[in-house]
Regions:
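Short beta-strand scaffold segments in enzyme catalytic cores
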Residues: 113-115
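Cytosolic covalent-transfer regions centered on His/Cys nucleophiles
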Residues: 1-108, 117-173
């Protein structure tokens, strides 16, 4: 007999941050601050300690890019006139500290981010608050990592020239 399907409802909070730079400059700055992950260096590291050391160098601000999608180009020719680039941003050494407790956390790791130009021509960063996603697993060890990711996200927002929200105040309880 199979187990019943589990459904988990949780609160999500989307954060929309105004960035001071024009779209192309903001995107370039983001990609400078969140470099592309070097998976080859990680897979050939030889030990987990060596992976941790490699990632420390690769992710000076805590995050690396695992994917970039140019939304603007894939909707070219449509009525949509937005400029937008989506990213998967994270750190697999941080994610592993949750994965060891529940592999399904990887549905939220890496984090999804979007840089876009709004109708008024202002550049925005959109991202969901990590701690709320990871708190939904009901495991304090996982929730604690979500809080750490909130702090890294706040730092990244500040480095991008945005105003980081007070994420601790936004957590339930």
């Amino acid at each position: 007999m199979t187990e019943p399907t589990t459904v988990v409802d949780y609160v999500a909070r989307r954060i929309l941050v105004a960035l001071p730079d024009a779209y192309d400059e903001a995107r370039a700055r983001y990609e400078q601050l969140v470099p592309i992950v070097d998976l080859e260096a990680c897979s050939s590291a030889g030990s987990w300690a060596a992976v941790l050391a490699a990632v420390e160098v690769q992710a000076p601000n805590g995050f690396m890019r695992y994917y970039r999608g140019d939304v603007t180009s894939v909707v070219a020719g449509s009525p949509s006139r937005w400029k937008a680039t989506q990213y998967l941003m994270g750190n697999h050494t941080i994610a592993e500290t949750m994965f060891r407790h529940d592999p399904s956390v990887m549905v939220y790791a890496p984090l999804r981010t979007l840089i876009y130009e709004d109708p008024a021509g202002r550049t925005r960063l959109a991202v969901d608050q990590p701690s709320l996603q990871f708190a939904s697993f009901g495991d304090p060890r996982i929730a604690e990592v979500g809080v750490r990711l909130d702090a890294l996200l706040s730092r990244l927002i500040a480095l991008l020239g945005g105003e980081p929200p007070e994420l601790a105040a936004l957590r339930p309880g």
